[in-house]
Curated annotation (Swiss-Prot):
SUPFAM superfamilies: FMN-linked oxidoreductases (SSF51395). The gene is GLO5. It is an enzyme of class 1 (oxidoreductase). This is Glycolate oxidase 3. Glyoxylate binds at residues 24, 129, 164, 254, 257. InterPro entries: Aldolase_TIM, Alpha-hydoxy_acid_DH_FMN, FMN-dep_DH, FMN_HAD, FMN_hydac_DH_AS. PANTHER family: GLYCOLATE OXIDASE 3 (PTHR10578:SF113), S -2-HYDROXY-ACID OXIDASE-RELATED (PTHR10578). GO terms for biological process: defense response to bacterium; hydrogen peroxide biosynthetic process; oxidative photosynthetic carbon pathway. Belongs to the FMN-dependent alpha-hydroxy acid dehydrogenase family. Its EC number is 1.1.3.15. GO terms for cellular component: peroxisome. Homotetramer.
Length: 368
């Protein structure tokens, strides 16, 4: 069967993967309202395309933190990719490098930073949680630096693990034979097989619930790598992130896996962009499944997007080739959207190219 869009990979992955694994990747917190809303909110944003513009040449390339990449579509950190495919993060790394874009490696990966680096050249970021034992954090960051990773994506929306009910029902645990490779030798590689998500006790015991803004300064003191703050969805926190020297912000609700009933990231994006006032770049993850979604995010001020579940499902369906094709499809759709909207480069994508349901007060539109 010819795969024609990114969503089709999820159907294949659901058929191929054990229920426990598919549910772990696919589910969100509690009622999963935000999980649905991350997608639905994109569908409420409409285009205002401009016509009769020469779009015979289109450039989708961009720069992120000074690094040249082929397109504003990057790979978000997702945990334990060997549950999806035996090659796990190595396949994702190779596919991302081939596409000329950035991969963010989860610190809860089933391949180590060194193994991922060994796949060849590529621009890679390292996702980090801060643990009570700061020595663990120092070791992880140093290893990422030495392996040539270019930035730290600090996850800040997880003082505790969200309640994912399918994981509780399935008694989720890391399948036998897989380990969290970055923690080998740190006495943290084993997950307690409790009756919750299996990760909850691990996170509760190790992730530092007292994490605060001052810890960003501490992190800057142990690394020269730029720090992206991942998990900002309000203007207030965006301003503080700038004050504390964040190199960038990732507007993220953790794939709707943490606090349910937070806004879709595409809805929260513009508030954050306006608060930042162009001082640092703002990125988005959550719900991106089409090239049209990428365009909408950029029109609302994002410098680029990260995709998470599409990489997992394409990996499960067809390994490295699946991830390559997924990225190529998103790129092709995005380029087509640019052409049909009258944009030849990312610079030309503007707020005037879209209409959102918060643009015009409803009472006003009712009068027109």
């Amino acid at each position: 069967m010819e795969i024609t869009n990114v969503m089709e990979y999820e159907k294949i992955a659901k058929e191929k993967l054990p229920k426990m694994v598919y549910d772990y990747y696919a589910s969100g917190a509690e009622d999963q309202w935000t999980l649905q809303e991350n997608r639905n909110a994109f569908s409420r944003i409409l285009f205002r395309p401009r016509i009769l513009i020469d779009v015979s040449k289109i450039d989708v390339s961009t720069t992120v933190l000074g690094f040249n990449i082929s397109m504003p579509i990057m790979i978000a950190p997702t945990a334990m990719q060997k549950m999806a495919h035996p090659d796990g993060e190595l396949a994702t790394a190779r596919a991302t490098s081939a596409a000329g874009t950035i991969m963010t490696l989860s610190s809860w990966a089933t391949c180590s930073v060194e193994e991922v680096a060994s796949t060849g050249p590529g621009i890679r970021f390292f996702q980090l949680y801060v643990y009570k034992d700061r020595n663990v954090v120092i070791q992880l960051v140093k290893r990422a630096e030495e392996a040539g990773f270019k930035a730290i994506a600090l996850t800040v929306d997880t003082p505790r693990l969200g309640r994912r009910e399918s994981d509780i029902k399935n008694r989720f645990a890391l399948p036998r034979g897989l380990t969290l490779k970055n923690f080998e030798g740190l006495d943290l590689g084993k997950i307690d097989k409790t009756n919750d998500s299996g990760l909850a006790s691990y996170v509760a015991g190790q992730v530092d619930q007292s994490l605060s803004w001052k810890d960003i300064k501490w992190l800057q003191s142990i690394t020269s790598l730029p720090i992206l703050v991942k998990g900002v969805i309000t203007a207030e926190d965006a301003r503080i992130a700038v004050e504390y020297g964040a190199a960038g912000i990732i507007v993220s609700n953790h794939g709707a896996r943490q606090l349910d009933y937070v806004p879709a990231t595409i809805v929260a994006l513009e508030e954050v962009v306006k608060a930042v006032e162009g001082r640092i770049p703002v990125f988005l993850d959550g719900g991106v499944r089409r090239g049209t979604d990428v365009f909408k995010a950029l029109a609302l001020g994002a410098s680029g997007v990260f995709v998470g579940r599409p990489s997992l499902f394409s990996l499960a369906a067809d390994g490295e080739a699946g991830v390559r094709k997924m990225l190529q499809m998103l790129r092709d759709e995005f380029e087509l959207t640019m052409a049909l909207s009258g944009c030849r480069s990312l610079r030309e994508i503007s707020r005037t190219h879209i209409k959102t349901d918060w643009d015009t007060p409803h009472y006003l539109s009712a009068k027109l």
